[in-house]
Amino acid sequence: MPAFNSIAGRIRHVACIAVLLALAGCAHVPANPPQPWRDAGQLVLVTVADWNADHGQLRSFERDDAGQWVQVGTTAPVVIGRAGAGWGLGLHPMQPDGPTKQEGDGRAPAGVFAIGQAFGYAPHAATALPYTGMDAGDYCIDVSTSPLYNRIVDTAVVGEAAIEGSTEPMRRDIHAGGDQRYRIGFVVEHNPQAVPAAGSCIFAHVWKSPTTPTAGCTAMDAAVMERLLAWLRPDADPVFVLLPQAQYLQLRGPWALPGDAAGATHADSR
């Protein structure tokens, strides 16, 4: 996740602690770890059949007056990483099972993540999220050894040398033959501390096609993305959750996730 706009400092602090504990080799995970997303009022949930599935289903939820999750709108198909999913670095505690997201592995990060800034090709967008219209000089740095790793930068500010080796121009329509996948989207705040080689530049964005997976992002129909951006509000502290079905069933109670998405990810609606 690029670091140009992160969620509240309290969330970043807890996420940092989780990363440092993992890097220190901590083997003990509390039975009921802190949930920095407990105050989230909006939640985007993506469930996939298993760790290797490259497509799944997206649902949106908001809390009612009683604090319960209620689905908003309809379920939509999505594509994720070409190699499936792997645990990412987000708001959730480290998990003992399953693959781990690494730079260039083609997996989408699994877990609970803050939703960051929206972006797109146009100067403005119909969203309450902070929004940045991208220019030809904007890149997301996916070079693990760069001091700008996992950040969206402007070459007019950092210089051309700073983006050497990056494969993530934010104006794909200009640099990649008219590609519309980044026409509109938002940042999924994976790896906020920019741990080298842990994965970078994770977005929710428009898909190339319903059957074309991504390098690690979550992609969907443009109309679905537009509805999401029109609905999301920064004051609701929205979060993005991606889990394989088995892990969702296991964690939805302990993690206080919506409880009515079970069993719906196996039908291929592409």
Predicted segments with their positions:
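Short, linear, compositionally biased motifs with a strong N-terminal bias
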Residues: L20-L21
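Conserved "landmark" site that anchors the functional core of diverse proteins
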Residues: D221
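Bacterial N-terminal signal peptides that target proteins for export
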Residues: P2-A15
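C-terminal motif of bacterial Sec signal peptides marking the signal peptidase cleavage site
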Residues: A24-G25
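Residues that recognize and position ribonucleotide moieties
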Residues: T218
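Cell wall/extracellular polymer interaction/catalysis modules
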Residues: H28-A215, V224-R270
